[in-house]
Amino acid sequence: MSKQLNPAVPDQPIVLGKMGSTYGIRGWLRVFSSTENAESIFDYQPWFIQQAGKWQHVELEDWKRHSQDLIIKVKGVDDREAANLLTNCEIIVDSTQLPALEEDDYYWKDLMGCQVVTTTGYELGKIIDMMETGSNDVMLVKANLKDAFGMKERLVPFLHGQVIKKVDLTAQRVEVDWDPGF
């Protein structure tokens, strides 16, 4: 199944998905993909997992869509018991494999921790999560401890031009046109 490959471990690891429950008795597992198109997770190889603090390379033998699920067969994992050991393992790749983005497009991982500030200079807090809502992405912003409006968290739509006025990843800052009381 896997072997220690210290020289090849990701320098810039990013989680692209998670291995789910076993499927059948021959070592297949369900996969939950975090990529925009679920099947795109298979475009990024090699996969790594961490178990007991150690990196392990995971080589795919096969994958397929089964009903609504994606299922995988990991090389060397041939029964339910062996597959069960991989349940809930995060699928990790090196983020240098991700394609370059166009202007005004951002990977969520790059927005995490950015300070969100209104156009009037009010600091709303830091981005702690992103959510996909169907119509647009939404930032979950953890408010500063002494927020003047008593907020703990805010949901701010990630609408470039409309709400998002400027993103400076170097300064870890996102400027928004947003009412701090909302």
UniProtKB/Swiss-Prot annotation:
Chief location of this protein within or outside the cell: cytoplasm
One BP annotation, GO: ribosomal small subunit biogenesis
Entry-linked Pfam families: PRC_RimM, RimM
Gene Ontology cellular component terms for the protein in this record: cytoplasm; ribosome
NCBIfam families with a match to the protein in the record: 16S_RimM (TIGR02273)
Family according to the record: Belongs to the RimM family.
Name of the protein described by the UniProt record: Ribosome maturation factor RimM
